[in-house]
Design a protein with these regions (language model features):
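Positively charged
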Residues: 1-136
Length: 136
């Protein structure tokens, strides 16, 4: 189901709680909401649709991947960039890493480990920041 985008900075600044198998529908809601906002958005965190759970969706270029309880386990090659966010107006400077490795659970609750680089790594880092209440 397509959900409204949350723009409340206080809510977005709160850390998320771990997701459980019972939260699978939230992942589906993220898929629907990202699809509805495709022209202006490449990733989302569950708190952006009003749910403080550790769930994100990242556009990988050819597919959108939902990640439950995602954690960055390694990162390399720091750089400065500017980013926008559907929950905020304008762009802001931030620091990201060119390459990351992330662990997460998929829709089947199978643990995954994936190496990401470039734009996809940047999207993933932005969304994982949302989970800890960090807003660019």
């Amino acid at each position: 189901m397509v959900k409204q985008i949350v723009r409340d900075i206080f809510f977005l600044g709160q850390p998320s709680e771990p997701a459980t198998k019972a939260d699978i529908q939230i992942g589906k809601d993220l898929q629907d909401t990202l699809q509805a906002n495709r022209e202006r958005c490449v990733g989302m965190a569950a708190n952006m649709i009003g749910v403080r759970k550790n769930i994100i969706i990242v556009n990988m270029g050819f597919i959108d991947v939902v990640m439950f309880n995602s954690v960055i386990v390694s990162k390399h090659d720091m750089y400065e960039t500017e980013e926008g966010c559907l929950s905020l107006d304008g762009v802001r400077r931030t620091t990201r890493y060119q390459e990351i490795e992330v662990e997460y659970y998929d829709f089947n609750w199978k643990k995954q480990r994936q190496k990401l680089s470039g734009w996809t790594a940047q999207i993933c880092q932005h969304e994982i920041d949302h989970l800890s209440g960090k807003i660019i």
